[in-house]
Amino acid sequence: MRIRILVPLLLIALGATAQGKKTVFSTMETNHIRVATPGLFSQRELIELPLEDIPDTEYSFPLPGGKVISPYGRGRGRHSGIDIKTYAKDTIRSAFNGVVRMSKPYSAYGNVVVVRHDFGLETIYSHNFKNLVHCGDTVKAGQPIALTGRTGRASTEHLHFETRVNGQHFDPNIIFNMKEQTLNRQR
């Protein structure tokens, strides 16, 4: 199944291609979570994520065995991701192959890792006790990238997990079946 996501194009300039991954990021990209990448989609406002083409070996649930305790979009404010509960210092894994765009403390996110994947998809992992990767590192699906914690604005150990395209967050449930901890290939 192909997931279609409307992507607002903000600027036209040079940037990563939809298929290619940059290994050198701008200062803006390494310092901010919400960053639109100009030219990422070559004038298209719609991208497709071919979930059916992703082999199981190129996907990993970011926190195997964890339980969603706060869904996307609900709560006192607009929740830009989901919260997955586990025990302290549990291993967080990269959901897909990609390149680390950001790895540092960042405001309410606490210690955060942002990984850019094919098709312009980015996954965000925050409130980490410790980040295990650095900006520019290439990561594989399932590779440990951080340990769960409660840094930033967090009241308990958990993973705050987001999916973004061109700086815009969207519901991770579009791509992931949180209950089964698999890709949502049958949506």
Q: Model-flagged regions — what are they?
A:
Residues 94-132:
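Zn2+-dependent peptidoglycan hydrolase active-site motif and core
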